[in-house]
Every structure is written in C-alpha cells, then in structure tokens.
Swiss-Prot record:
Coiled-coil spans in chain: none
Gene: purL
Self-association state and partner proteins as the record states: Monomer. Part of the FGAM synthase complex composed of 1 PurL, 1 PurQ and 2 PurS subunits.
EC number: 6.3.5.3
The protein, known as: Phosphoribosylformylglycinamidine synthase subunit PurL
Entry binding sites for Mg(2+) 1: E100, N548
Length: 741
C-alpha cells in the first residue's frame, strides 16, 4: 500500500477502515517516508491493532496515570503491570484477579460475544500461572420490552446469559457473583463485564514477558482462523450495527478446547517449563508477541508458516491479527521443548514453535520465505496518548417536588420491578458450586426459597479455612446525574457488600464503561470517576490492582457512565461468614450507618418518574465507623444486608425471604421524609439482625428498628406504612424477571 504518496483524503479512508485518526495516519506516513519505504499490509495492520483505543488506551492513559497510579499497599504483588493483578492471600498463596469488558462483540453477536468474554478473562488469570477458581459477571441491558433495535433486547439478554452459562459451566468454573441492571440507555448497546479470580502458590506466578534472548515462542491451544479479525479496531469506534463486517470481528469460543488447555498450562507451570506467558485476546499474535518481547526489552523473529491454521488460505496479515480463541503464547528455554511436547500431547493440545526472542530491537516476521514485517518494537509500542479535553455538563435538569399518595402500592411495584426483583432465573443457569469451594452462594437461605447474597465467599485452598469474598456492580443512573458521586456510591456499596460477610476489604478492580471519548462531557464523567476511585482507595488504604477501560459504547447516544467496581475481601474463617437472610424469630433488627436520603438515580425515582437530581456525597468517615462496628461485633451478628437498590424497604424484605421470617419495624428514628427513608439507596447504611442478649451493645451503635416475627409490618411513628405476608411478596419478587428469559 502506497502510504508515502497517499493524499490526505486517501489517508482518511484508510484510517477509517483501521479506526485510526487523520493525525495517526500522518505519523505512520512520516515514519515510512523517513525509512524510504511503504509498509507491508502486515505492518500496517499491526500498527492499527497496537494503536487502537482498545489496545493502547490512548484516550484514557494520561488520566489513568494521573489519578490511579501506584494505588498499592503491603499486600500488593503485581498491580497494573501484567494481564491481571496479583495479591497476597496468605504466606504461601496469592490470588489473581481481573475484569474485562466484551461490549461491542456482545452487541453484534450476544451469545458468542459473552462466551468469549468469559473465555478471555479466564485466560488472563491463567497466563499469570494461576488456577481459575471463580467467575463474576456484571451485565447492563436495555429495556427488555424494546424491539426497535438491530436485535431485540430479549434476544441480547438471552444470548448473553446463555453464552456466559455455556462457557463457564462447560469449563467447570463456578460463576459466583455479579449484577444485572436494566435501563433503556443500554438499548442495543449492552455492557458485558466478566471477571475471574485465580489462586496460585506465590512462587509459581508467571510474568507476561520474555525473560531472555534465545527463548523459543510456542503457540498452543486452538488453531488460528479468520474469526475475530479487526476485533480491537471495531471495539475502538462507535458501533455500526448495520455493518455486516462486524460479525466477522466477533470471536468464536470453544470451551472444550480451553478446558484441557488449562490443565496443560498449569502442569507446564508446575514443572517450571514456562519462562513467560500471555493469552491471545485482542490483537491476537500481533499483541501477544509484541507485548511479551517489548516488556522483556528484546526483539525477535517469527515464522508465520509455523502457525497452525483453520483455513490454509489465510493471508499473512490475517494470521498475525486474528483473535481466534483458546490460544496461549509461551516462552521457554529450547531445551525444555521435549518435556513441553510430552505434556501438551498428553492433553491433546496442538502447538507449534513460531519463533524466538533475540537480542535486538526489531521484530521480523517471515511468510513463505519472504520478510513481511520488520519494525522496531518501540515504534509499534510507543503509542499515541491524548489529553482529551473535558467539560462539566450544564445542569439542564431541575428537581420537582413530589409526594407519594400510595406508599403501599409503591412498595408492591418496587419489589417486583426489574431492578429489584429476584435474579434467580439467571443465577440458576450458572453452576455456582462446581469445584466444591463456594461457601456463600449468590442465593442464600432454604432450598427454593433463597434470597440474594451481597457477596460470594469462596474457599480457594484445600488446607485452609481462609476465604475470598467478592462482589461487583455499579450505579449508572446516579453516575449520569453526578459522576463523582455515582462512582463513590458504587465503591461504598461494594465495600459494604464485603464487610457484611465478615470479610476484610482487600482489593479493587475496575471496569470503566463509557461513551465516545471525543465528547467532552463523556470525558468529564470519566475523569470524575477516576477521582472518586483514587479518593476512596486512599481513604480506606485499599489497593487498585487491575482495570479496564471501554470507550465508544454508543448507539443513538452515549450509554450512561458505568464504572463497574469489582471488590475482593479476605475472611479468616469461611465457617463464620455472615449471610443476608434473617435466622430466627424474636431477634432484634438494627440500622448501622446512615441513609443518604437522596432519591437521585434510584429505582424508586425511575419507577415513579420523579424528577430528582439533588445528591450530596455520602460521608465516607461514617463508613469507617460502620466497618469498625461490624469488625468488632461480627460474632454477635446473625444476618446483615446493605441498603442499596430499592432502599431499606427492599433490604428488609429480601432478608425475610431466605427462611420465611418477617419483621416488625418502626422507622421513626430515621429523621427524614418517609419516601426518602424508605427508598433512598445511597449512603453507608446496613441492616443487621442480632440476638436479644446483644441489645445493650447495639443500642449504642445504631438505630433499633424492631424485631423479627411471622409477617411484615412497617410503621413510621404511630402511622402504619406497610403490612403484608411474606409469601405474597416472595411471589411478586420471584416473577419480575422470569418472563423475559
């Protein structure tokens, strides 16, 4: 391709096909003009892959470095360096954690996009040398009644859930936690965030880099095909759902190949045969080879003829950037090759030696005895970085006075509404107990009568009762109104979800989903989100160990800002984990912490179409106090549930479901309007159940609301607010989501 003599118009056409800007194409033209030759198609495609938004974070890197750099603590092993974060678990083990988005593929082909998102996040953990032990997914869908898009919303919902189910279940890795959220702002543009936790002995962690010159590069696992070509490019621009080429950019997943690949990789690692490793995700070989060599300050030579193909007619550039799944790139000393072959043959894993690392700065690639690529790795890897401008949106919305004339009806509507109702129709499709290490499941309580858990707890090491708690979610409607406040509340909720299990909050992983970064208001939301994450992480001395940014999530308009927060915690003894359901009748119920009172961005305000945009940041110093109360008194706590979606009324009702134990509470000591105290979702509040003998202790720590009993009664002073049977509410709660699946 004659880039050197291209006109500006022709450069723009080429750039558009590769998701590169005019200025980026000028940089490429300038470079090749200086070296007095045109790029090969392999070189041009590789540059486009490396410089894509998806791969190099060119719109976010400046702000990520400014606000989120070095948020570590004494437990951090690796953070923001390799394919996943690594955190100390105990003296002998570490855990590995990562979350990624797979949004654009899931919008085009929901089943395949979601399935390969799961497969990819598992390999991100695997390539660090860890055994994957748990999956997490947070899903954001449009209005399930919407049929106006390229694909109906129900088709997207069912495709995504089925893809996650089939891939995870067939691999035998439990799906233990996550969230599901619905809003018309995601119509035709779902957000699919998949997370994974792995466990490894601390001396078995593998880095995503080549360690020394002369090491061979081995490609193993699935064969390379035309699926997933230009995947990173189409994920780096606004999605055109009418473009048929997008379907070719969606990878094809095969868990039957990945399952033995996991066993083989772990065995090779146990034998000490792997010196560096990376999974092949976005960008394929182009990304994996380039990043491993550059991280090791080495160059190398690759022979594309050695790559095992699904289609022998593939062109060299297609081989180089294909994103075919279930592939791993391993570096090793050449003397280890016979042992490596024995292990891979035992697991029936295909492999080939495709090249080696060398003491030079360039990467050379050959195909059919012809050099098709010869570039310095520094040119490919030192990608453009933009300091995108941002501005605060004008406050176009004003709150309007509101009074609810039928609280009883509102509570009934709320409990069956799509963002409060039971997630069991989805959760039950996932195997959350395979491997036998899930202690607190996503549903808790009596069989067929369960309620939601706030966080899952897993026991990852056989000879230890220590465990990991994990939760994931976001508050998109509030993020739209107040990006800093919405991100802060997302972090507060995650923190509460961890501490109510009895665990110690440990690490944060973010997956930041936003619209077009060229929109200054979108960038404002993004920057405010980063500030909130920084402030919260520093305040609570946590560690931010891994993250992901997904831009260009847009169809008709940008999606709502969706900073998904995955948080982990460490629990000393999983046998003492606290769950959400009420345990006994005639126990006492207390409110610990405080309800913010704002109805901005709540399920209730959406349900009632309330114009409410007034929000003030919750007091995170109060959250410190809540943490200390739970930590110092967890042996006395029978049940605990955070106040979040649906407010305190939803929290209390959900606690009643697990064992059919009701409550009689009086909200008179919560000093705000009835609508606000019932339905505000923000703040530091947690509802706990304690035995009668602990009354004196907790009278000094929180607000006594009432006691557990047979049915449900809510008072506000002398006024009856709500009265119902548990069974009636459970039927409503159970029926909200099932009709869409």
């Amino acid at each position: 391709m004659d880039i050197i003599n291209c006109s500006d118009n022709d450069l723009d056409l080429i750039g558009k096909s590769l998701a590169l800007s005019h200025d980026e194409m000028l940089l490429i033209k300038k470079y090749f003009t200086e070296i007095k030759r045109n790029p090969s198609d392999v070189e041009l495609q590789a540059i486009a892959q490396s410089w894509s938004e998806h791969s190099c974070y060119k719109s976010s890197k400046f702000y990520l470095k400014k606000y989120l750099s070095n948020l570590r603590n004494e437990r951090t092993i690796l953070a923001m360096e390799d394919d996943a974060g690594v955190v100390k678990f105990n003296d002998d083990y570490v855990y590995v954690v990562k979350m990624e988005s797979h949004n654009h593929p899931s919008a085009v082909e929901p089943y395949g996009g979601a399935a390969t998102g799961v497969g990819g996040i598992i390999r991100d953990v695997l390539c660090m040398g860890a055994q994957p032990v748990a999956l997490v997914d947070s899903l954001y869908f449009g209005d399930p009644d919407n049929k106006s898009g390229f694909l109906s919303e129900r088709f997207i919902i069912n495709g995504v859930v089925s893809g996650i189910r089939d891939y995870g279940n067939r691999l035998g890795i439990p799906n233990v936690a996550g969230s599901i959220y619905f809003h018309e702002g995601y119509n035709t543009s779902p957000i699919v965030n998949a997370g994974c936790i792995g466990i490894s002995r601390k001396d078995k962690i593998v880095r995503s880099r080549v360690q020394k010159a002369r090491d061979i590069l081995i490609l193993c696992g699935g064969r390379t095909g035309r699926d997933g070509i230009h995947g990173v490019n189409f994920a780096s621009r606004v999605l055109d759902l009418k473009n048929g080429e997008n379907r070719n950019a969606v990878q094809l997943g095969n868990p039957i190949v990945e399952e033995p690949l996991i066993h083989a990789i772990l065995e090779l690692n146990d034998l000490g045969l792997i010196t560096g490793m990376k999974d092949l995700g976005g960008g394929g070989l182009s990304s994996a080879v380039t990043e491993m060599l550059y991280a090791g300050n080495l160059g190398g030579t690759i022979n594309l003829d050695s790559v095992l193909l699904k289609d022998d007619n593939m062109l060299p550039w297609e081989i180089w950037i294909s994103e075919s799944q279930e592939r791993m790139l391993i570096s090793s000393d050449e003397r280890n090759l016979p042992q490596i072959k024995d292990v891979l043959d035992k697991w029936n894993i295909e492999f080939s030696v495709i090249g080696r690392a060398e003491e030079k700065k360039n990467l050379e690639i050959y195909y059919k005895n012809e050099k098709v690529f010869d570039l310095p790795l520094e040119f490919i890897s030192k990608t453009p970085v933009y300091q995108r401008p941002y501005k605060k949106p004008r406050n176009r919305c004003k709150s309007e006075p509101f009074r609810d004339d039928d609280i009883n009806k509102s509570i009934i509507s709320l409990i069956s509404s799509i963002n409060v109702c039971s997630r069991a129709p989805v959760i039950r499709q996932y195997d959350h107990t395979v491997r036998g290490a899930t202690i607190v499941r996503p549903l808790t309580g009596l069989p067929n009568n369960e309620t939601h858990s706030d966080a899952a707890v897993i026991k990852p090491v056989d000879d230890s009762f220590a465990g990991i708690a994990v939760t994931s979610g976001s508050k998109p409607m509030l993020c739209t109104i107040d990006p800093y406040g919405g991100a802060l509340e997302s972090l507060i909720e995650a923190y509460k979800n961890i501490i109510v299990t009895g665990a110690e909050p440990d690490a944060i992983v973010d997956s930041l989903n936003f619209g077009n970064p060229e929109n200054e208001e979108t960038m404002y939301s993004f920057v405010e989100t980063l500030k909130a994450i920084r402030d919260f992480t520093l305040k609570f001395k946590l560690q931010l160990v891994s993250g992901n940014v997904s831009f260009y999530n847009k169809n008709v308009s940008d999606i709502m800002p969706t900073p998904n927060i995955m948080m982990t915690g460490i629990i000393d003894d999983v046998r003492k984990a606290i769950t959400t359901e009420f345990k006994n009748k005639n126990s006492l119920i207390y409110l610990i912490g405080s309800i913010n009172g704002s109805l901005a961005g709540t399920v209730y305000s959406k349900l009632k179409d309330i114009k409410c945009y007034d929000y003030h940041n919750s007091n995170i110093n109060d959250l410190c106090n809540v943490y200390n109360i739970i930590k110092e008194n967890k042996e006395k706590i029978l049940a605990a549930h955070d106040v979040s979606d649906g407010g305190i009324i939803a929290a209390l009702i959900e606690m009643s479901f697990g064992k059919n134990i009701g409550f009689n509470v009086n909200l008179k000591d919560i000093k705000m309007n009835l609508e606000n105290k019932l339905f505000s979702e923000h703040g530091t509040a947690i509802v706990i159940e304690v035995p009668l003998e602990s009354e004196i202790v907790f009278n000094n720590l929180g607000i006594k609301l009432g006691y557990t009993c047979d049915d449900i009664t809510v008072m506000d002073g002398e006024n009856m607010v709500f009265n119902a049977r548990i069974s009636e509410l459970k039927n409503l709660w159970d029926s909200g989501l099932g009709k869409y699946l």
